[in-house]
């Protein structure tokens, strides 16, 4: 199943996309500039991990960066996660630029799966860091290998090269669970589009600029791709556009 997700943020504020996906709530009814993780979640809240826990799932959240970012270490348990795993819990991870790689995140997910109780259901929510902005600096451990014709924008080259690495990590994840005995669903989606430093070049290549976008074109900056894959039959669909706050419910319905 593939399509585009409507999200409420662009260029940052990943926590708001997390909030919408995990709780099913929408940012549309909160004041502009709100960060629910920091302002509105002060106790246990009904959410996807809490629901899955009632069905017997072990629920794990992992984010290979600082535990206190967006107060995740405080909020995740309130949403129903049994365990939260952050940067310091990764042993000898691979780094791309200054962030733990998506490949190391895949290894961690596989580790969770292989260490769980046999036949016990598991839900892992993984928020990656590899492709975090900005993209203007050069690093000794990463050299962009994608270029854009007639463009010297290094930030764009680095961003696209990082996305390529994410594709490879996703391929590894799917290849592993294709062989798994237990039914498995993988939901892969973006939190937000990159910053204007990347997007401006793409617009220019298409003869466009920020000052001359229609309302419909501006809305496209708040869409990200998603894919739902399973190692059993959940049906196939392309162009299944939706909003991130509906995604979890739609996945549960498909999962059966």
Predicted regions and their residues:
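Solvent-exposed soluble domains appended to multi-pass membrane proteins
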Residues: 1-256
């Amino acid at each position: 199943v593939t399509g585009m997700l409507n999200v409420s943020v662009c260029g940052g504020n990943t926590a708001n996309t997390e909030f919408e996906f995990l709780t099913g709530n929408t940012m549309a009814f909160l004041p502009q500039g709100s960060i629910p993780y920091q302002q509105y979640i002060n106790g246990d809240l009904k959410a996807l991990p809490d629901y899955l826990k009632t069905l017997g799932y072990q629920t794990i959240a992992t984010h290979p960066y600082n535990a206190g970012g967006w107060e995740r270490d405080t909020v995740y348990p309130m949403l129903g996660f049994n365990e939260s795993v952050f940067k310091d819990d990764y042993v000898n991870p691979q780094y791309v630029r200054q962030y733990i790689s998506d490949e190391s995140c895949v290894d961690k997910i596989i580790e969770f799966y292989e260490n769980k109780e046999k036949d016990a259901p598991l839900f892992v929510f993984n928020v990656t860091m590899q492709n975090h902005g900005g993209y203007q600096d050069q690093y000794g451990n990463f050299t962009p290998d994608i270029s854009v014709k007639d463009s010297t924008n290094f930030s764009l080259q680095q961003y696209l090269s990082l996305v390529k690495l994410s594709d490879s990590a996703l391929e590894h994840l799917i290849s592993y669970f294709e062989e798994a005995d237990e039914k498995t669903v993988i939901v892969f989606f973006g939190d937000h589009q990159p910053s204007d430093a990347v997007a401006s070049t793409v617009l220019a290549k298409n003869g466009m600029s920020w000052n001359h976008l229609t309302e419909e074109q501006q809305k496209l900056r708040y869409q990200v791709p998603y894919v739902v894959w399973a190692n059993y039959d959940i049906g196939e669909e392309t162009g299944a556009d939706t909003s991130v706050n509906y995604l979890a419910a739609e996945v549960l319905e498909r999962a059966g």
